[in-house]
């Protein structure tokens, strides 16, 4: 056999793997979604994850053997992407699985056969590892396969023993490595040496069950779980130095390089890293969006947003200044569509999401990078090596600049970020935004923790009762335990049982009264601390003492309004999923007495028609009078029935399910109406974005709708009187005014451009001549960026062969720069994007663009003359 493996494309490798196992009785299954069935798992991170319920005995398999090519995403080592040969966020895992059928001997034999016979890997280049106690696997490799003992390495449990958790199925594994340098011999083989070895096939033998004591018992039905990294085996067969230069990824890299006007192979290492990051991350985001993940600030949505932002920033690092991600995404889609047709089918959605996120982040990046550059310069000037947590938090809180991006840029400048200080600033802000009750909560919790061993948890009876006879267990004033308190005192009270709902799940706490013999306490809020319901209120009359028997009574009217609004949020989520997008998920909510608020993950706002349809659907459900079915169910059963759970929420083994059959089913501990008809009517007040990828709907229900409409009527009447038109004529009148304003603005912009061009024409007389080139470097007063760009293009057209660099200060503390180079100047090694980006740094800014035309900005207008002087000097030096 030849000393080198045969050359195959990535698609051919995938097909040959699946066909090999299909011919041996395996069912070929399509890749599962990157969104796992288990809501507690963020993303599909391994080929075996879709089969985990089978391995854990929770589901009976429909077949004994299966083979897949599974899409996976891992971001735990994201900082290593592009810097090592094999770290990626997106990868495909080829796998063959046996559920109680064949086991170790057959799995090893087939693993060796496909590696050596199908893929043609030379046997002398393969090394295998086994678990140090797995004598059976060792013997199979040595005696049946014929691997020499020098090339069988025993490894510890950390490397070669798979577990599903603290208890459950587990077993040893065996890995096959490819040796790039067999000439180094078999003495002292070190499989950790990634310059020589790459592990490409892992065979897991699930043969034990581990109990709570750590004891291993042989399983009656043993399973096989294997994984061959497609990118790794492709690197080996295509004989390239890393995974990125395989035909699975490199075409994406080439597209990015072409947009940037650079060549990958002749680029420096930092540029190659950026190109690799783009190549990898674009694969990830294309498949994530195709699997209906949308960018947001939580969960897998934030993973998507972070990856998109890293693509944009690394594009900037290689000189791409504008939007480019969809050009690169098109290459990724084309590479994937034969194996994963859904990426082409969802192309429009993918590109719309990427375009929106890229445009939004470019604005954030412009502001944040400029400010961070100033911070870094100041830190270095002071001889420090750490960016303060306060500065990092200001970037995050005020300008939306992500902490991890600050850390990444800091690392590039040999600095670190005080993350602990950042977290402290976050805590300070969160505490500063709380009301008086929340500020006291910390003291209350401390006091209750001390008393927890001596008093019982509060019994909540508010689902079925509005009044309770109770005993005062704990009395606090400003969080400090007291035996009694007099009229006029703000108090916190813990009762042994209560009908008051404590703030939870977005629903505010009940209001009402606690009364007794000569005592009246007005309760304004209720919060839950551990197992205790804390009633915040004011003693209106009498003296309250620990041990008093009292009557606790909620404000029934307020409760009715709150529970109507809470049920309305459930109907709202159901309507959004039905009408707008089944992938919509809750990102937060507020249920109060007078209104409701619902935050949800969505890449776009709702259209007027969609808002109307959502309203109509909810009001239809209200009119249909659907009765509630409320049950306590095991969590697994509730999920199996399709109950909606909020991602990231921790649930117990038993959950409360609010079910309006045929309409909505959610896990929820809040209070609700018994029939949708009790809501009365529902009206959406507003729909808007509150964060990138997060939308917010505010709405009212019941009598609050009438209050809202009365206010609207008054506003319409006032506008009608002001414009002296009928209410129905208002839209037309406003449109007319808007059109007139736009016309005026366009005329103004045209005049600005004409003025800039007129100013620039006078510069032709001042052009310097350097050999065959003409150079114009000048400052124009008060010219906006677009007009400045037009002036530079016009000047270059007139001088022909040469370079034009213009600067201006269009407004206070804002510098605008533009460079326009002829093709002959480009041939001298000068690129406008890189050139103007470097010049802009003098003004505390940055930028870039194409080799022939690029724009940049800055914040220090006083440095513009120096920047232009530097530009003049560098151009003369390069072209003279």
From Swiss-Prot:
Entry cofactors: Zn(2+)
Cofactor: binding comment: Binds 1 zinc ion per subunit.
Pfam hit, one: DHHA1
Enzyme Commission code: 6.1.1.7
tRNA processing is among the record's keywords: no
UniProtKB keywords: Aminoacyl-tRNA synthetase, ATP-binding, Cytoplasm, Ligase, Metal-binding, Nucleotide-binding, Protein biosynthesis, RNA-binding, tRNA-binding, Zinc
UniProt record similarity statement: Belongs to the class-II aminoacyl-tRNA synthetase family.
PANTHER family named among the record's database cross-references: ALANINE--TRNA LIGASE, CYTOPLASMIC, ALANYL-TRNA SYNTHETASE
Protein name: Alanine--tRNA ligase
Organism the protein comes from: Nostoc sp. (strain PCC 7120 / SAG 25.82 / UTEX 2576)
Species lineage: Bacteria, Bacillati, Cyanobacteriota, Cyanophyceae, Nostocales
